[in-house]
């Protein structure tokens, strides 16, 4: 029955972790001929997508794809315990841009992780610039929150606890005093 719902946003950054279930969901949407647009504002796992899952998702009503790279540095991926396959991530974004040019693509990145170098941050910027088409490439500055594993890591690598406290109230686009490299690089 048509209940008047035309847009659904999934606030779930692991919605596509189980590819079989992800594909089954969109196959059901297609089978039931639902006229609904789907959005993923908190991002999908970009390296876990496949051409098949991308095709089914787009045919099933996805308007675009939001993915989070965070960093294009393999070392920083390990530090963050994200460990995504950067090349597969790139291939999937390129496929979406080529096969679905009207799909709205959003890419989330961050810089300013403790121990990150300017060269590693530049790897992420170079990744963004190398992409043929991204509608919304976002770069945020890392915030270190008290009581987290990231805070422990930062303190173990010389980040001042006072700088962490000072950074808490800053917006994600403001330069944090915890930045591990030149402020000029970020601005």
How would you name each of these model-derived features?
Residues 1-106, 111-113:
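Conserved SAM/AdoMet-binding glycine-rich loop
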Residues 104, 119-187:
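C-terminal accessory regions of radical SAM enzymes
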């Amino acid at each position: 029955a048509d209940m008047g719902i035309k847009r659904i946003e999934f606030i779930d950054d692991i919605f596509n972790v189980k590819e079989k279930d992800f594909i089954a969901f969109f196959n059901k949407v297609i089978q039931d001929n639902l006229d609904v647009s789907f959005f993923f504002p908190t991002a999908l796992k970009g390296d876990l997508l496949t051409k098949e899952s991308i095709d089914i998702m787009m045919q099933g009503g996805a308007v675009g794809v939001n993915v989070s790279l965070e960093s294009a540095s393999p070392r920083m991926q390990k530090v963050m315990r994200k460990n995504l396959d950067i090349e597969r991530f790139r291939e999937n974004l390129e496929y979406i841009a080529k096969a679905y040019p009207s799909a709205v693509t959003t890419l989330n990145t961050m810089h300013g992780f403790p121990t990150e170098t300017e060269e590693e941050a530049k790897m992420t910027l170079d990744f963004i610039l190398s992409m043929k088409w991204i509608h919304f490439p976002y770069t945020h500055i890392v915030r270190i929150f008290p009581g987290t594993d990231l805070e422990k890591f930062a303190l173990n690598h010389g980040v001042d606890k006072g700088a962490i406290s000072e950074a808490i109230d800053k917006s994600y686009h403001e330069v944090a005093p915890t930045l591990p490299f030149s402020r000029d690089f970020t601005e």
